[in-house]
Amino acid sequence: MEPRALVTALSLGLSLCSLGLLVTAIFTDHWYETDPRRHKESCERSRAGADPPDQKNRLMPLSHLPLRDSPPLGRRLLPGGPGRSDPESWRSLLGLGGLDAECGRPLFATYSGLWRKCYFLGIDRDIDTLILKGIAQRCTAVKYHFSQPIRLRNIPFNLTKIIQQDEWHLLHLRRITAGFLGMAVAVLLCGCIVATVSFFWEESLTQHVAGLLFLMTGIFCTISLCTYAASVSYDLNRVPKLIYSLPHDVEHGYSWSIFCAWCSLGFIVAAGGLCIAYPFISRTKIAHLKSGRDSTV
């Protein structure tokens, strides 16, 4: 096999690996995870002996879980259909009253991606029970459209406006992330097709075009991943912090889906670099050979 064809085959292999990793990242939900077990243990130690025996070993006692004492009202206000409630929707329904203590927040282990946010099963028996009984949904869709939140009397109007503006900015960041990832997949697919065509027609030209498409895919992936990181940071630092931020002892971070996306970015940049750099390297070698022959003559 000629060196140019070998470089094209290597670039095509890297680009196909990149495409597989990128599609895996897009359609899996493990971009970001939270684990409040350490926070739960510290709350249990600080609250030792304060609760009845049947309420121990819980992050939040069941008697104080949101809407348990008044299910008819809760079912009218909560989204997601009749008879369903999101254990974290209490944030928007209770206002700021019961959030001054970190241990008063019902935090559960979650994982989220571009399209859904889900609760881990088998970690907290409270959320397991709620999901098995059909009271809570295990997964909720990530919003890509703006919906007007409920106006509550116990939240100041100015704070409501700030929350709405933050929701709007966060929505834009999510749209940018998903949009650029979609464009990256489309351009990468075109690059793979052009690289395949280069085996049969105008090898030098098509290889160069494929390299440009691969590098363009890398730019789109970089924009998307940086925007996703910005959206996560923005969401955790929203006002008021006692609602949206996480306690310091809650473990949270990026997971394997976003690692697949970063690996995809590395592969596609390598593929684009090979396709773009090889013609220049080969021309330099030819020029050196010609100059060597002329000098010997």
From Swiss-Prot:
Function description: Acts as a negative regulator of osteoclast differentiation in basal and inflammatory conditions by regulating TNFSF11-induced Ca (2+) fluxes, thereby controlling the induction of NFATC1.
Span list, region Disordered: 41-86
Family classification: Belongs to the TMEM178 family.
Compartment(s) of residence: Endoplasmic reticulum membrane
Cytoplasmic side: 201-208, 279-297
Single GO BP term: regulation of cytosolic calcium ion concentration
Low complexity bias (residue ranges): 68-79
Keyword Repeat: no
Domain of life from the UniProt record: Eukaryota
UniProt-listed InterPro entries: PMP22/EMP/MP20/Claudin, T178A/B
Name listed for the protein in its UniProt record: Transmembrane protein 178A
UniProt key word Metal-binding: no
Segment forming the signal sequence: 1-25
Gene Ontology cellular-component annotations: endoplasmic reticulum membrane
